[in-house]
Amino acid sequence: MTERLEVQRAIAADQHAIFRVLCDPRGHVAIDSSGMLMDATGEPVSAVGDTFAVHMDREALNDYPMGLYDVSVRIVTLNPGREIAWTIEGQLNLGHVYGYRLEPIDGGTLVTSYYDWSSVEQSWKDAAIFPVIPESALRATLGILARTVAPGIARPETAAG
């Protein structure tokens, strides 16, 4: 069984405009398709180790009745304009990583969204809670990201179509 999901979308926007959204705590809330992110506080991130708070409500997933809770997002990879990744710290520090890679293409940026839970302890993997977010949610978030940075603009063509 895979322990990583990756999805891609060509977006008709400059990679730096996209990266600004991904570095802004409120940007994470604005593009979230899971319905769990309610609000975020903190400054835009600029380095590995930077953190911000996200106010969560897991009700949208209809799986575990956690109520309202806060997590800390800690940046684990940051290459300006190219890649950003983070892990979640909070009630449980499981070690799963979310991220985006940005690649310039004609007419915009190819954005890869990924979710990796390969470093999670086996006992949590055995609990069958991963992936927490399905591939469809990653795809939907890319659609919302596109709408946020390039509203009404058609996707650029890629080699894959």
Predicted features along the sequence, with ranges:
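Intrinsic-disorder/low-complexity, polar/charged segments enriched in Ser/Thr/Lys/Arg/Asp/Glu/Gln
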Residues: 2-8, 51, 70, 83, ...
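Hydrophobic beta-strand positions in extracellular immunoglobulin-like domains
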Residues: 11, 58, 115-117
